[in-house]
UniProtKB/Swiss-Prot annotation:
Any Pfam family: Ribosomal_L24e
Protein family (similarity comment): Belongs to the eukaryotic ribosomal protein eL24 family.
Subunit details: Associated with nucleolar and cytoplasmic pre-60S particles. At the end of biogenesis it dissociates from cytoplasmic pre-60S particles and is likely to be exchanged for its ribosomal homolog, RPL24.
Keyword set, alphabetical order: Nucleus, Ribosome biogenesis
Protein name: Probable ribosome biogenesis protein RLP24
Length: 163
């Protein structure tokens, strides 16, 4: 069973699904859904349409250069069936998928870390600019006045008790 890629959005196309368009020069275009086919007919660039994988890779939102992508290449050479080779291949595919997911998760976390640092710098800058909103000029004076009043009252009480 061969799973094709959509020409426009790079999504998977399973057997019996999607649409195929063959141009006069025998170039084959496969589309996973009518949305992709319509955008192709409108001559839209997949790298500029925000929901496509091409846009995500071009904008640096997804991992693009990695050795794990080499295993996904299309191979058209028929190989003689051997049970051992088949089992090893399936085990290797599982391992490669596991490694790829770890690397993608790490890439996303690194990307998010940069944004957190920028957000922190912006927050500090905003607090410095609007410090008067956070701390009123007479905020500490109220406590000082209260303490003075308490001291004066205690002194008055002490003076009255002394004679």
């Amino acid at each position: 069973m061969r799973i094709e890629k959509c020409y426009f959005c790079s999504g998977p196309i399973y057997p019996g699904h999607g649409m195929m368009f063959v141009r006069n020069d025998c170039k084959v275009f496969r589309f996973c859904k009518s949305k992709c086919h319509k955008n192709f007919k409108k001559k839209r660039n997949p790298r500029k349409v925000r929901w496509t994988k091409a846009f995500r890779k071009a904008a640096g939102k997804e991992l693009t250069v990695d050795n794990s992508f080499e295993f996904e290449k299309r191979r058209n050479e028929p190989i003689k069936y051997q049970r051992e080779l088949w089992n090893k291949t399936i085990d290797a595919m599982k391992r490669v998928e596991e490694i790829k997911q770890k690397r993608q998760a790490k890439f996303i976390m690194n990307r998010l870390k940069k944004n957190k640092e920028l957000q922190k710098v912006q927050d500090i800058k905003e607090v410095k600019q609007n410090i008067h909103l956070i701390r009123a000029p007479l905020a500490g004076k109220g406590k000082q006045l209260e303490e003075k009043m308490v001291q004066q009252l205690q002194e008055d009480v002490d003076m009255e008790d002394a004679p």
